[in-house]
UniProtKB/Swiss-Prot annotation:
Species of the source: Helicobacter acinonychis (strain Sheeba)
InterPro entries from the UniProt entry: ATP_synth_F0_csu, ATP_synth_F0_csu_DDCD_BS, ATP_synth_F0_csu_sf, ATPase_proteolipid_c-like_dom, F/V-ATP_Csub_sf
Mode of membrane association: Multi-pass membrane protein
HAMAP family with a match to the protein in the record: ATP_synth_c_bact
Encoding gene per record: atpE
Protein known as: ATP synthase subunit c
Pfam families named in the record: ATP-synt_C (PF00137)
One of the record's GO cellular component terms: proton-transporting ATP synthase complex
Length: 105
């Protein structure tokens, strides 16, 4: 947790370190890209943790009762697809925020 706090604190300096030649539209583009990448990173990190937990629970359940391994595997694949869908939704939102930002028109 301390590492993340230090990382984001260091990132603030990069976000505000701009040359005086930038106008407001460039700042909006910069913040859009920064927000999209941070959001996508958080979504991918959370999705990876969720997928790892789902796989671990499936392996544990199959080890305890091998007879239901097929049903657990099917349920795990459905859960993984739903977890991955959330990351893809975040990717779509990030692409929209970068390329068709309503604040830039």
């Amino acid at each position: 947790m301390k590492f993340l706090a230090l990382f984001f604190l260091a990132l603030v300096g990069v976000a505000f370190a701009y040359d005086g030649g930038m106008d407001g539209m460039d700042m909006i583009k910069s913040y859009s890209i920064l927000g999209a990448m941070i959001g996508l990173g958080i979504a991918a990190f959370g999705g990876a943790i969720g997928m790892g937990n789902a796989a671990a629970a499936t392996i544990t359940g199959t080890a305890r009762n091998p007879g239901v391994g097929g049903k657990l595997l099917t349920t795990m694949f459905v859960a993984m697809a739903m977890i991955e869908a959330q990351v893809i939704y975040t990717l779509v939102f990030a692409i929209i925020a970068i390329y068709s930002n309503p604040f830039l028109s």
